Amino acid sequence: MARTILVADDNRGFTDLLRATLEEAGYEVVTASTGLAAVECMRRHDVGLAILDVLMPGISGDAVAERLLQVDPTLPVLLMTGSSGDFAVGSGLPVLRKPFPQEELVAAVRRLVPPA
């Protein structure tokens, strides 16, 4: 399985923090700041995990997840949300509630994409 992770979030500072955390944990990371850019990244890169913010400009993270899973139903997807609502939970996909400790992110990623 590819160890490249797609991180999609419209908050650039947060995306940079996640990239640094995941690279330190040994993963390659590509980023996108919109849902449409996330879909395009998936076309260009061999991604083994998609980490998607639920609320992004254009296409929402849960809609992106739905599109990606139509193409590859085995793709691990992890949603992130700062919302207190449970709308993302209904998707059946794992959800990290922002803010979350970096250790929680790495643990969730390792459950979905075990280290090589």
Spans of features found by a protein language model:
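Receiver (REC) domain active-site loop signature in two-component systems and cognate sites
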Residues: 56
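C-terminal output helix
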Residues: 100-113
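Charged docking surfaces used in two-component/phosphorelay signaling
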Residues: 13-24
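Hydrophobic/aromatic residues positioned on beta-strands within the core alpha/beta folds
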Residues: 80-81
